[in-house]
Amino acid sequence: MKSVTTNINGYIEGYYGRIFTWPERHSIIKKLNKCNFNTYFYCPKDDLKHRINWREDYNNQWLSALNNFCNSAKEINVNVLVGISPGLDYSFLRKNDFDNLIKKALQLKSTGASKIVLMFDDIPPYRSCVDKRCKSEGSLHAELANSLSIALSEDIFVVPRIYSDELIEDKCTYLENFNKNLNKNITIFYCGKKIISDTNKKSELNIIRKTTSNHIIFWDNLYANDYCPSRLFIGPYIGRKVFNNTMINPTGLIKTDLLILDLIKLSVSNKDWKNALKINGVPEEFYIIDKYFFPINFLQKNKCIDFDYYEEIKALDFLLWKWKTNLSREWYPYLLILKQNLQLLNNDLDCKRIKKIFPIPLSKAINNQKGD
């Protein structure tokens, strides 16, 4: 098996709103192996014992399932990272919280997890003024990671609270203090200049590289849609020429994410991204409306896009009513929402239909604007 700290690539189960079943996770690691990717990162925000109730132990049934998953992954040369996200309510003033953290990490390691990832993403700033040691938030997070690594007698990975340049506020010294105090053997996850960065080139890490020489893994949110659940991104793997030290955090839709892994594999091999769609049974009609499913940075590179309302509605009708597969069932709500939005934009919805498909306050506002 490849080292867990070099040339990492793979899948992050790290989104909001969805959580896989164990059979679905097994499907992902099989696809990772087929695509020559090597890592699965378990950190779903909706696992209560991962984040909100992080102090609580997992039950034996869940631990047995994780152990089986880790063993299956190891057999096909896939590493399993497991995250713990204590930052919402971790107390640096109570020793028993550190004891709880060690206990949880040891419990997860006992199942065969390759590495533990300590996560501080998506939490409010820690008010260090309440800490009697008067240490900065970045220093406290780094020292906690160091202490956990020492307690486990092994290197760990970490996600800092500031995990993208765009989260850096004026006079914010979090990253500087975090990186200055973090042990050099701890690997950092980072998203680059933006939470959804345009590329995964080394230049994306220029800011964080000013204050650290630690190994960095690029957390790629290109296909994530938990922040806009009415949309689906399934276009080309834009701005990425390689998939080393990069992990993708996509949708949580199993058939879609299996397709995305195919798409990435073909894209970084300079093959037409449509091959991935074809392999997964997507009809030709999808290419008439595919621009609506491209990643958000695509329009920045392609400002001139043609629209043909009637052809697009015709294609959507085919995809909605005649394309019937497991993948199409995942895409159905996104295709239908797109059709309704296009109809609304083209003034092609009557007031009765608007009342049916939009919440009452919105339907009233829309119909008032239309004069109906």
Please report, for each region that a protein language model flagged, where it lies by residue.
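Feature activates predominantly on carbohydrate-active enzymes
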Residues: M1-D97, L101, S110-S114
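Catalytic-core regions of glycoside hydrolase
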Residues: I12-Y15, S114, P125-V268
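Short connector loops/turns at beta-strand edges and beta->alpha or beta->beta junctions
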Residues: K45-L48, D121-P125
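Short beta-strands and strand-loop turn motifs
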Residues: V82-I84, F120, V158
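Short, histidine-centered active-site or binding-site loop motifs used for metal coordination
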Residues: I84-P86, D122, L222
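An active-site-proximal structural segment forming one wall of the substrate-binding cleft
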Residues: R94-M119, E137-A151
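C-terminal functional modules
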Residues: V268-D372
